[in-house]
């Protein structure tokens, strides 16, 4: 792929629409404007009304055009945006005309933002913030994406890198001047204190219970219990539709069924699972294993108990967590004696008690999302690099405390700096760039 290619794409929603935006970036914009726009190359950063024609002079449409010369543009290159009527025929004619010109092609997903990254206009976390704000469905997702897009995460990572650069400079004093009598003693203690402070800060960031990733990707609630306890009926009630098959036959649900919705201002994945019981059926047994895995990974577990015929062995077979919610179902029937302590009594079939349960679920998710203010980590990629960087910080501190050599400590600090640099995209990220930008829409 030549960096000299001029790229173009529809940057607005799919047609038909009142207005469409076609975006171009690259060094052939001057030639395109002269050949296809009646106004020629417009005055920079001014909306200019003009007629847009194809290579044969046929009128495509009349609309506005805005020219933003590089390097002071989103991509750092010359960019042009066409504001035309958003009908399919106009868009098809316009884009086919542009891409028929030599050196002009359709942009790949995220290519405009990738060029902005390569031009140093944004770093990798800010680029991810662009993708996240486009995909944001909730105010919480939007706020987190805006913070990332405007450099909120970068600021923290850059501060850590700056601190480590200062620490590295101090360690290298000891490496470069080993014969200075007081240098090691005067330098090592402050460096250890600085490393310890950084270790605590990174550990605190890693101890956020994944809230940043969950705000972005969704929290998970697992509905578990014995067969025929009403799990699928409750899922359908919470989903507002028939997402799961409901029958009176135990073991109907054999795989995990997930429903996505907003609760407590957050994206939530509700999982209906296979009934937990011993079974010789190979397919059902696999469903039980999947149910146990989903339960282990969930942010909240709902234990469904059949109020008429409770199977308490299910409650006893899984390690109980303080956040677990026990729900007695079939409250519209005569309840059996010996029910366990429960939090809510409902009839999933009729809906009695479900609004109160749903409100409790929303409160739990809302409180969990608010438990960490301004998370530093919003993607698994960030977390993995921080974990590796933290290991380097521990190794550097150990090398200094045990006296195994400042050279080893210096190398560990350099590695930690590289891990932090990989988060913002300043070093060693070629292997992840494709994955990051492929998640974007074409026109961004």
Regions found by a protein language model. Give the residues of each.
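C-terminal-of-GTPase-core extension/linker across diverse P-loop GTPases
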Residues: 2-14, 53, 139-262, 279-281, ...
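Short glycine-/polar-rich loops that comprise or flank the Walker A/P-loop
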Residues: 17, 45-48, 297-300, 321-324, ...
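Inter-motif core of Ras-like GTPase G domains
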Residues: 284-308
